[in-house]
Amino acid sequence: TYDSMIKTLEKSVDQGFDFVMLHNLFLMEGVELNRDEFRNKYRMKTMYRLLGSNYTKIDGEFIAEYEEVLVENKFFDFNDYLSIRALNLLFFSVFQGDLYKFFFRFLKDIGMPLVSFFESFMSPNPEHEWPEGYLRFVKDFKEAARNELYSSLDEMYSDAKEIYERNNDVGEPVRLNLYYYSRLMYSEKDWLNQVLRQHLIMENDKIDKNALRIADNILDICENLIIDLRQPCNNRILETEFDFEGWKQSKYREPLHNFRDGKRAINFSMRDSQMEKIRSFCEQNSNLNDRDFGFVAVETILPRSDLFYEIVYE
C-alpha cells in the first residue's frame, strides 16, 4: 500500500543509507508479474511511457523505446501513483543529485520525517500564499507526469513520431526527474529557499529560533554551492559556525552540533579538472537556452558532484 511504502522509505532514511531511491514498477516481457495470472490477481492497470528521448528513424523506419508502468492495482490507485511519482523526483534530486544535501540532512538531524517533508513540498497547502513560480513548478511537474503516460503503444508511437517529424528531432525532455531536477538547480532559485524555509516552519510549528537560524545559514550555503555554469566564479564569502565538510565525511552519522567549531568565514572553490570540464561544456552548448542548458548539464556533467563548489574554510 501507499502508507506501507512511506513507512519503508522513512525507515530507510532513518537507517542512514547514503542513497535512497524510489522507482515505479514497470513490467517487462518474461517477468513473472507480467503473466495474466498475476495481472488478474492483483488487478494491475498499466500504461506506457517513452524511455527518455530514445526515439528516432533508422533507414526510414521510426523506432522508440518504452516502459510499461504499473499505475494502479488492488492496493493503490492512480492518485497514489502520482504521489509516488512526485516523491520519486525529490528522492532523485536529493540523493542522486545532491540538491541542498546539507539542508535535507539537517531536517533528519532535528527529527523531521523527510518523506513527509517531500510530500508537503509537492502538495502545497492551498490555504497558504505561495510564490507563483513554486506553484507553477509543481503544476508543471504533475501535468508532465500525467502526460508522459499513454493508454496504448499505438498512441505512444504515433505521438512520438509526430513530434519527431515536426521537429526533425526529439521533443521536450521526457526524462522528468532530470529535467525538473535541473529546474530546481538553475531556474527556480528565486523562490526555493523561501519555500523550503516555510515548509520547515509548517511541518514543525514548535521549531525554536536557534534551529531556524541554523536552517537559514544552511539554505544560504546550499544555494551558493550550486555552480552558475555560465559564470562559474563565485566570490561570495559566507560565515558559519559548523564544519560541514567534517559532517559530510562522517556520513552524517553524528549530529551537526558535534561539528560546531566557532564562527568562520567560508568561500567556494573548484578543482582545475572541474573548471576544465565546465569550460568545455559551455563551449559546446553555449547556443542553448537556459532551461535546455541546465538539463543537458545535469545529464552530461558527471559525477554530479562536479556541479557544486567545494567549501574552503579560512
Outline where the language-model segments fall.
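A structural motif corresponding to the C-terminal lobe/cap of the Radical SAM core domain
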Residues: 1-121, 226, 232, 237-247, ...
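Generic detection of long, well-ordered alpha-helical segments
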Residues: 2, 74-81, 131, 182, ...
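Charge-dense, extended regions
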Residues: 157-314
